[in-house]
Amino acid sequence: MAVCAGRLKCFGNPAVSLRTAASRAYATTTSPDPAIPSSSSASSSSALPKRPQTSFRDKLNAGPSFSDFLSGGNRDDARILDPNEAYALKTALVGPKGKKKEITRLPSWLKTSIPDSNNYKRIKNDLRGLGLHTVCEEARCPNISECWGGSSKSAATATIMLMGDTCTRACRFCSVKTSKTPPPLDPHEPENTAEALSRWGLGYVVLTTVDRDDLIDGGARHFAETVIRIKQKAPNILVECLTGDYAGDLEMVALMAKSGLDVYAHNVETVEALTPHVRDRRANFQTSLRVLKAAKAAVPSLITKTSMMLGLGETEEQMWDALRQLRAANVDVVTFGQYMRPTKRHMPVHEYVRPDVFELWKDRALEMGFLYCASGPLVRSSYKAGEAFIENVLKKRRAESTGPESTNVPNVTPDAIVR
């Protein structure tokens, strides 16, 4: 009891408490001599469980320094890469263990943003409300956010697909649904399409269709009536029509060319040698050339346009041959884009063509006499069509044209079209 009382008296003394606290503080700031074992430290170390060693601290110590984040210097990775290294494709192993296979990653220059703009949502809602389809959605175009978004209404470009969403042909590159007996045409579609476009206030629109080999005229009269309705409701809008080949019926081609459209487009899709392997068996490179020639013959002031995909296995000589034939057919505009496989059911990509190669073919096309060439990995037939034509082709052609043809008044009326 005496001992306990003495200890209580010491702790109750302020002077003793201060000296004790000071000695404890000093003890924590001084390092004990490692040669002298401490019974208290030994007991505490045995009482506390040891943490497992991790390599996190080692990774930090061996990690990048501040100089690694600075450009320049004499480091090997600071040098400028040549195009072969910069555009080198990366691969990855995917699949379960033991069954992994190597795939080629999508190049960085082919990646796009997810569409989320207000203009995109508005156009999509209007399309659904009127029961209209677009090739942008059906063909899974990677540029939909850019084209539908647009910096303004007049800058936005929509590509409306007429005559339903089911095609009678089955090209190996296309993701549009196919059937031998697609649904019948909607008689209200021309009026609904014209109403939607006049409401949106777009400066440029691209109209395209599925192939309808089940119809006698291939749907040309339905297509022409739609153009006429649009020009009646929105005469200032520029209309580009991407048509099929109408099974080689050049009378239907002339009917479309005289409907009041501004640009007549028909895609050859690829070089002549690869056409049987890429397009439907009913499609033919020479037939496509005849379609483009017939459109120009029907309306000489009309702008004609075609598009080709790269990365299908075409050779340089085959490309030269295709361009020479297109120029001989007086085609005004050509576009080049990278083929991208929609699903595993479609033909695989033979090659991801580098952006500098697209630039090379653009320069070559312009040197051959094409009025305009859009060329790039993400370029599609209607990619930024309004911007390109307004600035580079259409205004120039209209300025040079004089007479009634320059006004582009339709030569036929809806009542004159015999169904």
UniProtKB/Swiss-Prot annotation:
Subcellular location as annotated: Mitochondrion
Transit peptide: 1-26
Assigned EC number: 2.8.1.8
Amino-acid positions noted as binding [4Fe-4S] cluster 2 in the UniProt annotation, renumbered to this chain: 167, 171, 174
Cofactor(s) needed: [4Fe-4S] cluster
Domain Radical SAM core residues, every copy: 150-371
GO cellular component: mitochondrion
Chain intervals with Low complexity compositional bias: 28-47
Annotated family: Belongs to the radical SAM superfamily. Lipoyl synthase family.
Catalytic activity: [[Fe-S] cluster scaffold protein carrying a second [4Fe-4S](2+) cluster] + N(6)-octanoyl-L-lysyl-[protein] + 2 oxidized [2Fe-2S]-[ferredoxin] + 2 S-adenosyl-L-methionine + 4 H(+) = [[Fe-S] cluster scaffold protein] + N(6)-[(R)-dihydrolipoyl]-L-lysyl-[protein] + 4 Fe(3+) + 2 hydrogen sulfide + 2 5'-deoxyadenosine + 2 L-methionine + 2 reduced [2Fe-2S]-[ferredoxin]
List of residues binding [4Fe-4S] cluster 1: 136, 141, 147, 382
Primary residence: mitochondrion
Pathway(s) per entry: Protein modification; protein lipoylation via endogenous pathway; protein N(6)-(lipoyl)lysine from octanoyl-[acyl-carrier-protein]: step 2/2
Keywords: 4Fe-4S, Iron, Iron-sulfur, Metal-binding, Mitochondrion, S-adenosyl-L-methionine, Transferase, Transit peptide
Cofactor note: Binds 2 [4Fe-4S] clusters per subunit. One cluster is coordinated with 3 cysteines and an exchangeable S-adenosyl-L-methionine.
Molecular functions (GO terms): 4 iron, 4 sulfur cluster binding; lipoate synthase activity; metal ion binding
Protein's recorded name: Lipoyl synthase, mitochondrial
Location of region: Disordered: 28-61, 399-419
